[in-house]
């Protein structure tokens, strides 16, 4: 990864923003989506990206964007207040059921073992979604390319079996949960456990927020995010806490 330290003092105003052409929405069938993209990408270091995330942006590989759809505002950026978070009964059960897992924090790196788990996860949990056919190159572009402070966290069983991987960006004011994939045959709400683990990491690092990307009220795939409270939503240019 290139050294971006010399760009730390560049002002946020050096970036430009453009809107993409419409494309099929990945979350709401029959809808067209557009994105607002921040460019040039080589100026987006961790400090700049932290500011962008605070304004509702997200990244996919080196592509930094936020929804910019015509006549639709369904995608809402959300973040969890880590210090005030209180798990519900289901979340406490998920936390207890995976206490035997061991987490190993590492730099981003290609691994056939990781790619195999990613493929099994996509085929088991999201068949026919397109990502279940991702090549090695597509996987690497999606999860292993970054210009910000990113970590790969491996979760293994006591026997050494790889159970889950979480890709996490370390921001100035929190952690951003980029993507998590896990063994589809392993029971016990691994996805929930990953978020709980990341909240604990925020507390350990004294970072106030865990950014969870976008929540969509009409998307079943996104519904779980509303279960982590206190939750703030970025609406009309400001973060607002959702009612309990």
Swiss-Prot record:
EC supergroup of this enzyme: transferase
Keywords: Acyltransferase, Cytoplasm, Transferase
Primary localization: cytoplasm
Gene Ontology CC: cytoplasm
EC numbers, comma separated: 2.3.2.29
Biological process according to GO: ubiquitin-dependent protein catabolic process via the N-end rule pathway
GO MF annotation terms: arginyl-tRNA--protein transferase activity; leucyl-tRNA--protein transferase activity
Compartment(s) of residence: Cytoplasm
Keyword Nuclease: no
Catalytic reaction equation(s): N-terminal L-glutamyl-[protein] + L-leucyl-tRNA(Leu) = N-terminal L-leucyl-L-glutamyl-[protein] + tRNA(Leu) + H(+); N-terminal L-aspartyl-[protein] + L-leucyl-tRNA(Leu) = N-terminal L-leucyl-L-aspartyl-[protein] + tRNA(Leu) + H(+)
Pfam families for the chain: ATE_C (PF04377), ATE_N (PF04376)
Annotated InterPro entries: Acyl_CoA_acyltransferase, Asp_Glu_LeuTrfase, N-end_Aminoacyl_Trfase, N-end_Aminoacyl_Trfase_C, N-end_Aminoacyl_Trfase_N
Record function comment: Functions in the N-end rule pathway of protein degradation where it conjugates Leu from its aminoacyl-tRNA to the N-termini of proteins containing an N-terminal aspartate or glutamate.
PANTHER family per the UniProt record, alphabetical: ARGININE-TRNA-PROTEIN TRANSFERASE 1, ARGINYL-TRNA--PROTEIN TRANSFERASE 1
Similarity-based family: Belongs to the R-transferase family. Bpt subfamily.
Protein name: Aspartate/glutamate leucyltransferase
């Amino acid at each position: 990864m290139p050294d971006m330290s010399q760009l730390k003092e560049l002002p946020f105003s050096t970036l430009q923003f453009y809107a993409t052409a419409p494309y099929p929405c990945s979350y709401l069938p029959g809808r067209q989506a557009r994105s607002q993209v921040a460019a040039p990408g080589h100026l987006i270091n961790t400090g700049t990206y932290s500011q962008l995330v605070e304004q509702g942006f997200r990244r996919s590989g080196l592509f930094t964007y936020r929804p910019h759809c015509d006549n639709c505002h369904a995608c809402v950026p959300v973040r969890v207040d880590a210090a005030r978070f209180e798990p519900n009964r289901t979340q406490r059960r998920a936390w207890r059921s995976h206490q035997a897992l061991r987490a190993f924090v590492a730099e981003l790196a290609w691994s056939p073992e990781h790619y195999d788990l990613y493929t099994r996860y996509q085929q088991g949990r999201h068949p026919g979604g397109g990502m279940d056919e991702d090549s090695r190159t597509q996987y690497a572009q999606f999860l292993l390319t970054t210009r910000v402070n990113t970590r790969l966290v491996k979760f293994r069983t006591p026997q050494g079996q790889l159970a889950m991987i979480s890709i996490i960006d370390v921001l100035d004011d929190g952690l951003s949960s980029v993507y998590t994939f896990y063994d589809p045959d392993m029971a016990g709400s691994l996805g929930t456990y990953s978020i709980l683990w990341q909240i604990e990491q925020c507390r350990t690092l004294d970072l106030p927020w865990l950014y969870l990307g976008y929540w969509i009220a009409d998307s079943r795939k996104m519904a779980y995010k509303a279960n982590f409270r206190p939750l703030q939503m970025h609406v009309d240019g400001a973060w607002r806490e959702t009612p309990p």
